[in-house]
């Protein structure tokens, strides 16, 4: 098994974990927890990534928690934090987990240098000492300990609130750190919404993020039955709050592409993700496009926005036989296909 660079540097420092009950969190993408479990008392995972949760939920040896907040009781006395792409998400996870685990908790932080992992030095200052103990593979390995009482964590304090103006409608948006387009109206989403036809029936908002697209669709087309899905628990929590803030109804749930969805959508609408961590990542969107026909009703329609450089039309044409470009500007294109 080839481990990620942060896991490889952690593997060099296994002595730090001996005798510990380790809770792993953050931007973890490989099977390293199985290796780590051989060297510590117990290993558990807290993840906001539904795909990663499903991967580990099948194994009894490592307990895996999924959600936007760790609410379960744990005996962990050490956190292994894989530094996430967004600094604000790192701060959110750190504050939440230390509030849960409490004073005297040890922490190891690993991450690629270009991800900004050095920020942990200032971020952890109010909790206790932390120092870098290793550097390799353009990554850093920090160890520290919480010597101060962590403040009480209230998730509601972490929602960023902002407004989106679309046509004559004002949408109140509530967004947690780590959610796509946190705090702003994405220009691709705006072009997508400007291009959408009148919607009816069962509509899927794939990769719902903070819930902007779904909320606008439901506001303009109040009779639709709206499903909103995302792989991120932070996005799910944000979309639920955004719907609530606008007195809108929709079904919001985690799904690894179509793993938990139905198969009778009149419309699948998406501003699909193509960044996973610091790397460009297409596989989930490819699955979205390839399997769209079997998840649409007769004459059902797929409509998505994408950066112009992404090679989605050939995938859509292979799945549907045709791909239309409904609109474009200097950065984005709106693609459509009908079953």
Curated annotation (Swiss-Prot):
GO cellular component: cytoplasm
Major location (coarse): cytoplasm
GO MF annotations in UniProt: 16S rRNA (guanine(1207)-N(2))-methyltransferase activity; nucleic acid binding
Compartments, record wording: Cytoplasm
Alphabetical keyword list: Cytoplasm, Methyltransferase, rRNA processing, S-adenosyl-L-methionine, Transferase
InterPro entries from the UniProt entry: DNA_methylase_N6_adenine_CS, Mtase_sm_N, rRNA_ssu_MeTfrase_C, RsmC/RlmG, SAM-dependent_MTases_sf, Small_mtfrase_dom
EC code(s) of this entry: 2.1.1.172
Catalytic activities: guanosine(1207) in 16S rRNA + S-adenosyl-L-methionine = N(2)-methylguanosine(1207) in 16S rRNA + S-adenosyl-L-homocysteine + H(+)
CDD domains per the UniProt record, alphabetical: AdoMet_MTases
Origin superkingdom: Bacteria
Family, similarity comment: Belongs to the methyltransferase superfamily. RsmC family.
Assembly and oligomerization: Monomer.
Function according to Swiss-Prot or TrEMBL: Specifically methylates the guanine in position 1207 of 16S rRNA in the 30S particle.
NCBIfam families recorded: PRK09489.1
PANTHER family, A to Z: RIBOSOMAL RNA SMALL SUBUNIT METHYLTRANSFERASE C
Protein known as: Ribosomal RNA small subunit methyltransferase C
Taxonomic source organism: Aliivibrio fischeri (strain MJ11) (Vibrio fischeri)
